[in-house]
Amino acid sequence: MPSRKFADGEVVRGRWPGSSLYYEVEILSHDSASQLYTVKYKDGTELELKENDIKPLTSFRQRKGGSTSSSPSRRRGSRSRSRSRSPGRPPKSARRSASASHQADIKEARREVEVKLTPLILKPFGNSISRYNGEPEHIERNDVPHKNTQEKFNLSQESSYIATQCSLRPKREEVKLKEIDSKEEKFVAKELAVRTFEVTPIRAKDLEFGGVPGVFLIMFGLPVFLFLLLLMCKQKDPSLLNFPPPLPALYELWETRVFGVYLLWFLIQVVFYLLPIGKVVEGTPLIDGRRLKYRLNGFYAFILTSAVIGTSLFQGVEFHYVYSHFLQFALAATVFCVVLSVYLYMRSLKAPRNDLSPASSGNAVYDFFIGRELNPRIGTFDLKYFCELRPGLIGWVVINLVMLLAEMKIQDRAVPSLAMILVNSFQLLYVVDALWNEEALLTTMDIIHDGFGFMLAFGDLVWVPFIYSFQAFYLVSHPNEVSWPMASLIIVLKFCGYVIFRGANSQKNAFRKNPSDPKLAHLKTIHTSTGKNLLVSGWWGFARHPNYLGDLIMALAWSLACGFNHILPYFYIIYFTMLLVHREARDEYHCKKKYGVAWEKYCQRVPYRIFPYIY
C-alpha cells in the first residue's frame, strides 16, 4: 500500500475541485483505502482530495510585480498610424484578446472536471443540528465537451438525489446543490458549460438495533418480556429457578373497562397539556430553518394530576383496582401503543419530506419501529413531546402510590414500610426533577433525531410506567425490612447520584443557553467546525456522559431498598446500564460524524465514556 505524503495537521495548498486554483488547507485525515485526504479550507469547508491535487506550501513562490506583455516596440503605437486606420476596423489588440479569450474558453470547456458528489439521505435531517447525512462520499468523473450536454435522470421510489453544479469564476467558486424532482428535468447552461451527472444509487444506510431483524424481534419480544417479568414478580418465590411462571389465559388479560380507564387517563393528560399555562419556548432549528414552539407546563400538569388523585382518595375511590388489574392495564397500554404506532406510520406517508426523521431508512418495518416522522403534530399538539413526559412519567408516580396503598392493605400495615417510602420518595424526586427541567428535553436525541414510532411510543407509554415502578410492585408481595443505618447509606448514595446527575445536566444546559455567561468563564472548551464548543472541564471533563453515571447511581439506590433476597428487583439497574451504554454508543457515532477532528481531540482530553477509570 503506498505511503502517505502529507501528515495530519499539516498546512498545504489544495486545488479546488473543477478549477486550477489552489487554496491553503489543513490536512484532517487520510483514507488508506481510497487514498483520499480529508482537508479543511479556511472558510470551514471540508472536502476529500487526491494526493495529486495537494501541493506543499514551498512549491508556491510569490510572483514579482508586473505582468507579461509584448515587446516595447509593440506596446508603443504610432499615433499617425493610429489616425490613418479605418474607423470601422476594431483595434488589433481587441481582436487578439477576443481570440485569446475564445481559445481560453475552449480550453476551459474541455478541461476534465472532477467533482466530489455527496448524496444526501433519502430524507431530511429534521432537527439535526449537524446537518450531516451519515452516508459515504464518492467521486464522479466527467469529461466536459465544448458544447452543452443535457442528460435525463431516472429516480427510484420516493427519493430525490442531488446533482452538483460548479460555476467557476476567477476569484469566486461556489458549489450549488440543486434538488432534482422525481420527474425528468433539464439543466440550463450559465457561465460555464453546465455538466449534469448521472447519480448512482445510494447504498443502504447502516441501521441500528440490528437492522430489520433486530427491530422485528424487539417489537415482539419486549411486550412478552414485560409480561413475564410482571408474572414472575407476583409469584411467592420469584426465583429464576421458577421460570417460566404460570401463564394466565389470554381472555383473562383483556378487560374493556380497564382499557376505558386507560383512555380516560390519557385524555386527562391531553387536556392538561393543552391548557394555556406555562411559558412557550422554541426548539432546535429544523432542516428548513423553522423552530417549533413548545409549551412547558409539565410540572403544572403534575400538580393538577396530584390534585385530582388527592380529591379521588378523599372521595373514597378504590385505587386497589389498579393493582388487582395491573396486568390488564399493561396490556391496555400495549394495545393503545400499537394502535398509536400504526396511526403515526400511516400519517407519516403523507408528511412532507422536510418533516421526516433523520433516523428513518425507507424500510417499512424499520421505520415503523424507529419512527418515520420527526415531529408529528395535530395542530399545535405535539404527539411525541406530549408522550415523552406526561402519560408515562406522571403515570409512573401514580402507580407507585397505588403500590404503596396496596402494600398497606395486603400486608395489613398502618404505615408503609421504610423500603416502600424510600422507593416512592426517590422516584418522585426523579420525576419532579424531569418535569421541572422540561426544557432540557428539547435537545435530547429522542426529540432532535429519532422519529416517533413504536420504539418511543412503547417506551414512553408502557415500559416507563410498568417497568420503572417495578421495585414498588415487587415490595407489595415481597416485603423487605430496611434498617435505619442501611437506609442512611442508601440515601447518601441516592444524594450523590442526584448531585452528579443534576450538576452535569445543569452545567450543560446553561452552557448551551449562553456560552458567554461569566459564571461559566472558568470552563475549558474545544472549538468545532460547526461553530459550537465542547466542554472539557467541570463535570464534562470528568467523563463524556457524567449525567449517565449519576442516573445509574440513583437507579442502584432504588434497587438496594428492595434487599438482596432476589435478583428480580435489580433487573432495572441491569437493563438501565445496557440502555445507557447503547445510547452512549449512538451519541458517540453521531458526535464523531458531526464534529470530526474536534471530537477526536475531545476524546483524547476526556478518555472515559461513563465510568471514570473503567469505561
Swiss-Prot record:
Membrane topology per record: Multi-pass membrane protein
Principal cellular location given in the protein's record: nucleus
Residues annotated with Phosphoserine modification: S59, S67, S71, S86, S97, S99, S128
Top-level taxon in the UniProt lineage: Eukaryota
Compositionally biased residues, Basic residues: 73-86
Cell compartment(s), UniProt: Nucleus inner membrane; Nucleus; Cytoplasm; Endoplasmic reticulum membrane
Residue numbers on the Nuclear membrane side: 1-211
SUPFAM superfamilies per record: Tudor/PWWP/MBT
Domain Tudor, residue spans: 1-62
N6-acetyllysine, modified sites: K55, K594, K601
Family annotation (Pfam families): ERG4_ERG24, LBR_tudor
Pathway field: Steroid biosynthesis; cholesterol biosynthesis
CDD domains in alphabetical order: Tudor_LBR
Annotated transmembrane regions: 212-232, 258-278, 299-319, 326-346, 415-435, 447-467, 481-501, 561-581
Enzyme class: oxidoreductase
Region spans: Disordered: 53-109
Listed GO CC annotations: cytoplasm; endoplasmic reticulum membrane; nuclear inner membrane; nucleus
Modification comment: Phosphorylated by CDK1 in mitosis when the inner nuclear membrane breaks down into vesicles that dissociate from the lamina and the chromatin. It is phosphorylated by different protein kinases in interphase when the membrane is associated with these structures. Phosphorylation of LBR and HP1 proteins may be responsible for some of the alterations in chromatin organization and nuclear structure which occur at various times during the cell cycle. Phosphorylated by SRPK1. In late anaphase LBR is dephosphorylated, probably by PP1 and/or PP2A, allowing reassociation with chromatin.
Record field: catalytic activity: 5alpha-cholest-8,14-dien-3beta-ol + NADPH + H(+) = 5alpha-cholest-8-en-3beta-ol + NADP(+); 4,4-dimethyl-5alpha-cholesta-8,24-dien-3beta-ol + NADP(+) = 4,4-dimethyl-5alpha-cholesta-8,14,24-trien-3beta-ol + NADPH + H(+); 4,4-dimethyl-8,14-cholestadien-3beta-ol + NADPH + H(+) = 4,4-dimethyl-5alpha-cholest-8-en-3beta-ol + NADP(+)
Biological function: Catalyzes the reduction of the C14-unsaturated bond of lanosterol, as part of the metabolic pathway leading to cholesterol biosynthesis. Plays a critical role in myeloid cell cholesterol biosynthesis which is essential to both myeloid cell growth and functional maturation. Mediates the activation of NADPH oxidases, perhaps by maintaining critical levels of cholesterol required for membrane lipid raft formation during neutrophil differentiation. Anchors the lamina and the heterochromatin to the inner nuclear membrane.
Record's protein name: Delta(14)-sterol reductase LBR
Protein source organism: Pongo abelii
Name of encoding gene: LBR
